[in-house]
Amino acid sequence: LIVLEGAIELEITREKLPLIVKGFLAALIILIGNIYVLQFLFKALFGMEGAPAVLFAIPLAIISSAVAIPSASSLLQLEREFVVYESTFSDILGIMIFNYALRQLESQQPLLGAEPMVSLGLQIIGVIVISLLITYVLFRMMQQIDHKVKFFLILALLILVYAFGKVLHLPALVTIFIFGIFLSNVKSLLPPFLRKTLDLEATEKELHEFHILTAESTFLVRTFFFLFFGFSIQLSDFTSTSPVLYGLLIFLAMFALRYVYFTATSLKLKPSPLVYMSPRGLISILLFLQLNEVAFINLEESPVDERLLLIVILSSMLVMLLGTMKKDQKKEIEIQDEEAPLSVEMDIEPQSLTEKDNKNL
């Protein structure tokens, strides 16, 4: 649901292609950079290395689009669109890298290598073709089904496709992602010979309703997971200051890397508001809790636990809040300057007026 909602949010046009590429590169480079930095920190602080360090680093490195996109409403239009693309790509790439790393490590295969990378590339190409066909079939279903209840049926079919992908060891999330991309950009991405057989104008309203249903379902899932995560945290667990200090150090390292990236790409030392837009959230929690099922990881004895994750999440959200507040204050000052009335003060002394001027007055 989270990947599907993020993909539906992406509007792909020729005019926005440079911005999309920038958002994708920022998400990929910062994500990979954070994983390497966190691996180094985990080894230096906790003596952790190898597979556990990689799997613990990935959830902490992912930006939460669920938090970043609504928080970017006060930014300029280009900055807001960049946040949408970067955070969505960070979510999707992070989940894909996590599942890929988990599959490789559980099968005791190397993370990087020619064979696994070629295999992954071929799988993604196959998934794109499958997603194209699924999009066409679901559009036909939207037009053929007259019953009121049809959107949950479509979601059920997508869940079925995801389950088949997991069973066949395919990147199933890529299927959902590509489907969402095709769904929201069907007029520009669907081949002409398939578009001719579909009444796209008639399905626009239904697509909008499907988007709303997906967004509300995702919001419900997010809410419950945040509640469950909150229930799992006990204040008595924070008797030691070590998790707080380690969490702050990890967040500052990731924030410094983000600052360096945006400084290098914009050639400006003054931090952009985009630097602050890197909150952690639901995806980090979900992937972190998934580590409970990994055989070679023991979360109860690990120094990287829920307390450290909570500190990183709260720190990232607090920095984002301060960054957006600073942006709002600048905007308010600029608006006040623009709306200030133009006034000209003239000092005229009555004594300087001549008799002729007095008569005219």
Task: Describe each PLM feature range.
Residues L1-K22, M142-D146, L158, Y162-Y246, ...:
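Membrane-interface junctions of multi-pass transporters
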Residues L1-V3, E49-S64, S119-I130, P171-S184, ...:
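Structural signature of hydrophobic alpha-helical transmembrane segments
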Residues I12-K16, I69-I128, M141-K148, L189-R195:
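Alpha-helical transmembrane bundle and helix-membrane interface signal
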Residues K16-L76, Y136-V137, L235-E334:
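Transmembrane alpha-helices that form the ion-translocation and gating core
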Residues L17-I32, L78-F89, D146-L157, A215-V221, ...:
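Cytoplasmic-side transmembrane-helix entry/capping segments in multi-pass membrane proteins
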Residues I35-L41, D91-E106, L160-V174, R222-L235, ...:
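Hydrophobic alpha-helical transmembrane segments in multi-pass integral membrane proteins
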Residues I92, I124-L133, L160-L170, V186, ...:
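Hydrophobic transmembrane alpha-helical segments of multi-pass transport and channel proteins
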Residues K187-E216, Q329-L361:
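Intrinsically disordered, low-complexity non-transmembrane regions of multi-pass membrane transporters
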